[in-house]
């Protein structure tokens, strides 16, 4: 869980009358690289998982909107209509490892497939902006095997999740998270860059002779790292939110100083101070 403004997530199934499920990965199963032993006919898509939760009480309005690679925007109108008819919208975008997905014939991620840009491919950015423009609450779920440079989405979309390639039960697992049966607890194992030009992106930049410059510049006063942006990631290594809160206390180490190859043993007291069950990756 990368972002969750105003606690939009988890969704309360009892308060919803309708939900829009939109995007090129909404009715798709992404098995991920080196999983060709799975039969692509099996598995649960996000759309199927959400419909299972919705039952007969919540209307599910589905629209693909666009494909992962084509610039064709003709399906966006249908996606906007689905959003306008719904209480909340869940967008499933991202990438594909084609041979290991259900239907796709083109890869945008995986071994042997490199892109020269880290923005979302095809008409996906246009789809996201069109759905956001309806004014309905929007949740963006990235089903992908890599990070994306999505500064506009970070600024304008209230809730963002990354599911990666979750396998044949991906639809059930993401529905459980969206509706609060399970609290997300994952942490990023790499950073999300601001743009393709921000690579490499990491937190521990070496200090230069000019010091640290973490603020974006302007046309009148250019910055000294990246001229018009700061050299910090959208989300850093280790970032990850959940639906509850935790309190760290009584930090103890087994000694006061360490040599280079020593093992550091640390003990803490960890308390769930929120109202939901949850897991915490201590860091």
Residue ranges and their predicted role:
Residues 1-283:
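C-terminal non-catalytic regions of proteins with extracellular/luminal or membrane-system context
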